[in-house]
Amino acid sequence: MKNIILASASERRQELLKRILEDFQIIVSDFDESSIPFKDNISSYVMNLAEGKARSVSKKIMDQDNNLVIGCDTLVAFNNKILGKPKDKKDAFEMLQALSGNEHEVYSGLAILDVKSNKIITDFVCTKVKFSKLTSLQIEKYVNTGDPMDKAGAYGIQGKAGVFVENINGCYYNVVGLPLNKLNSMLMEMGVNL
């Protein structure tokens, strides 16, 4: 069995991976996301970011042959504009105000790299999420919890912001940060059966 390495500091990704895999390592990627400019295609962009994270970690462990590195990146898009992590409370408020009453997309790019062979596969998942109409007071109260500050799109579906979600079309785990079904099929493609 290959050693699985998750190239992520995200606690949410680690928790999700623990649901399907008992034994894996975490090595945080030091990949500079700004080194890949966003051109136009969000799905290609998130796959490139995921690959960059996986390759960054693989360079740290090149002397260890039996490793598969999982890279992942998740972005929120609204009107073909990327909503990253908010810079401050005002930014978080504005993001949530824009999402209020509207549908947006959550994209996750996945990359799995076999360190020994340098074989890499990439893929992405897109989930559509519709928010209810939110009041300014609801948004302000949520922003003041601090919860939105480390999350793309300024919300976490698995937390207090779950009540904002009117409906979801696609993979719930993608919105949390790690699309488990897609990851499982990619791991199988790389010879890992969970």
Curated annotation (Swiss-Prot):
<comment type="similarity">
    <text>Belongs to the Maf family. YhdE subfamily.</text>
</comment>
<dbReference type="Pfam" id="PF02545">
    <property type="entry name" value="Maf"/>
</dbReference>
<dbReference type="GO" id="GO:0005737">
    <property type="term" value="C:cytoplasm"/>
</dbReference>
<dbReference type="GO" id="GO:0009117">
    <property type="term" value="P:nucleotide metabolic process"/>
</dbReference>
<dbReference type="InterPro" id="IPR029001">
    <property type="entry name" value="ITPase-like_fam"/>
</dbReference>
<dbReference type="InterPro" id="IPR003697">
    <property type="entry name" value="Maf-like"/>
</dbReference>
<feature type="active site" description="Proton acceptor">
    <location>
        <position position="73"/>
    </location>
</feature>
<protein>
    <recommendedName>
        <fullName>dTTP/UTP pyrophosphatase</fullName>
        <ecNumber>3.6.1.9</ecNumber>
    </recommendedName>
</protein>
<keyword id="KW-0963">Cytoplasm</keyword>
<dbReference type="GO" id="GO:0036218">
    <property type="term" value="F:dTTP diphosphatase activity"/>
</dbReference>
<comment type="function">
    <text>Nucleoside triphosphate pyrophosphatase that hydrolyzes dTTP and UTP. May have a dual role in cell division arrest and in preventing the incorporation of modified nucleotides into cellular nucleic acids.</text>
</comment>
<keyword id="KW-0546">Nucleotide metabolism</keyword>
<feature type="site" description="Important for substrate specificity">
    <location>
        <position position="74"/>
    </location>
</feature>
<feature type="site" description="Important for substrate specificity">
    <location>
        <position position="158"/>
    </location>
</feature>
<keyword id="KW-0378">Hydrolase</keyword>
<feature type="site" description="Important for substrate specificity">
    <location>
        <position position="12"/>
    </location>
</feature>
<dbReference type="GO" id="GO:0036221">
    <property type="term" value="F:UTP diphosphatase activity"/>
</dbReference>
